[in-house]
Amino acid sequence: MHYSVSLKNLARMQLSAFVHQVELTSLGNILITMKGTVPGFDAVILSTVPVGAGLSSSAALEVATYTFLEKLTGRVSKKQEEKALACQRAEHEFAGVPCGIMDQFISVMGQEDHALLLDCRDLSTKQIPMYDINEFLFLITNSNTPHKLSSSAYCERRDACYEAAKVLGKKSLREATLDDLQVLEIQKMPEYVVKRARHVITEIQRTVDAAAALEKDDFTKFGELMNQSHDSLQKDYEVSSVELDTLVSSAREVKGVLGSRLTGAGFGGCTVTLVRKDAVNEVIDVIKKRYPGKATFYIAKPAGGARYMSTDIAKSDFDSDIENA
């Protein structure tokens, strides 16, 4: 039996329920972006990445699909950034979601026990080793409240950043400095524009400082920067929520926690906490007591990006992920 579906028709689907449609539509566009003939195939998708939790489930599927198609066709991307950009286009052009590039880059370029420093001006990257990461864990806590970033909320923040950059005569706030914030205040820009710009400018500096801290094996400093990041997301960018703030404040009560912050776009979803291995169970217990909802916990560490795996290894890793979840 042969069954075919026009991929062009998928592009006209209503995507208001993003988390239910983007995986299918992104996969369809990845097939389109592959040059040459793609042979027919049957596919089963298994995942332990929760959908709609702000953990980049869409990018994970896009990059995994592209990696599979490289293996299937024998046509491997010459440059890793080209692969990441192709997956981003799948979301932009086919799913209609104006996502950034960070999620696709880490899914493609991730290395075990490393962080990835990405400069979005020229898409240059640097692998940052995390030498003593084995002493710590990243505890991901899913608030299980919908990860909802409305189009109006997203556009308001994006437009505020564009407006601030325009007033400063910059191509983007990536070129701005803390001194430029005074210019915005002198120009009597609306308070919300100043706040959005302050978050972006300080977050860029925190990212640079975080990479430097990891290179010095200073996880204490790295944790402090995580805390500062969340506080800025909460007060200046205003994308946190009562649920996320509760998870973060609860985690910070535990002595073995170095830092905790929301992850993803905010407005629900997950937090990520850097914690010493011997304190992770205490963190989970405290959160269960403090958080009125039902949180889900995932223990994670920096791992490699998408790659081809034998079925035996894949099943073993999948079962391990289920146990850790």
Question: At which residue positions do the language-model features occur?
Answer:
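N-terminal pre-core extensions flanking Radical SAM catalytic domains
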Residues: 268-272
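C-terminal nucleotide
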Residues: 1-18, 114-259, 273-325
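A local structural micro-motif
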Residues: 39, 78, 95, 173, ...
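Gly/Ser-rich oxyanion-binding loop with an adjacent helix/lid
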Residues: 3-131, 280-285, 304
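A short glycine-rich, hydrophobically flanked beta-strand micro-motif that places a catalytic Asp/Glu
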Residues: 41-45, 244, 260
